[in-house]
Amino acid sequence: MATLLLEDGTIESNLDEIVRELAPLGIYLKHYDPGTSILFPHLLTQDALTDKEKCHIVDLHNSVFEFIQQENGYLWCDLLNVHPGSPNLQTLIATYAQYHTHTAPEALYVLAGEMIFGFVKPDGSQVQLLVQSQDYLHIPSGVEHWCSLTASLNFKAVRYFTAADGWVPNYTGTRLNDSLNK
């Protein structure tokens, strides 16, 4: 389940409260239990996956969660699989660890692992959201955010796209608030 860290150090783990905190940004967060991870647990524990295994995971996931694509107008999806041996891991981390926006929404369903997303709220305050297995996150276009892997460096998620070119980051130059940089 997701948790939210506020600037004052408060940690919120109640999903309804997290959703309320993120509502001014238009962010949608939902936890689906059980998730599709029960359909392919052996593949979720592997670091490296073949293209065939990735397609198998996405196909099984879509057989259960096809409504996510239909309800939100997503055109396509893929599997993001990051692990300590991923090629260009440090480049990937550096690319998304800076505050940025996208012209298209960013949406994903977490299959395994965890990731941290930082957001700038309308009042300028910042929050950090930890998403975990079975969490679905939709970030509207234009929302200022960053994301980072946790120390495990393991993360698998189905990513959803509304544009052919995916999520192209537009960097904003906003700095991470020191109270959240722990």
From Swiss-Prot:
Transmembrane segments: none annotated. Pathway: Amino-acid biosynthesis; L-methionine biosynthesis via salvage pathway; L-methionine from S-methyl-5-thio-alpha-D-ribose 1-phosphate: step 5/6. Keywords: Amino-acid biosynthesis, Dioxygenase, Iron, Metal-binding, Methionine biosynthesis, Nickel, Oxidoreductase. Its cofactor is Fe(2+); Ni(2+). It is an enzyme of class 1 (oxidoreductase). Its EC number is 1.13.11.54, 1.13.11.53. It catalyses: 1,2-dihydroxy-5-(methylsulfanyl)pent-1-en-3-one + O2 = 3-(methylsulfanyl)propanoate + CO + formate + 2 H(+); 1,2-dihydroxy-5-(methylsulfanyl)pent-1-en-3-one + O2 = 4-methylsulfanyl-2-oxobutanoate + formate + 2 H(+). GO terms for biological process: L-methionine salvage from methylthioadenosine; L-methionine salvage from S-adenosylmethionine. Pfam families: ARD (PF03079). Fe(2+) binds at H100, H102, E106, H145. GO terms for molecular function: acireductone dioxygenase (Ni2+-requiring) activity; acireductone dioxygenase [iron(II)-requiring] activity; iron ion binding; nickel cation binding. PANTHER family: ACIREDUCTONE DIOXYGENASE (PTHR23418:SF0). Belongs to the acireductone dioxygenase (ARD) family. This is Acireductone dioxygenase. It comes from Nostoc sp. (strain PCC 7120 / SAG 25.82 / UTEX 2576). The gene is mtnD.
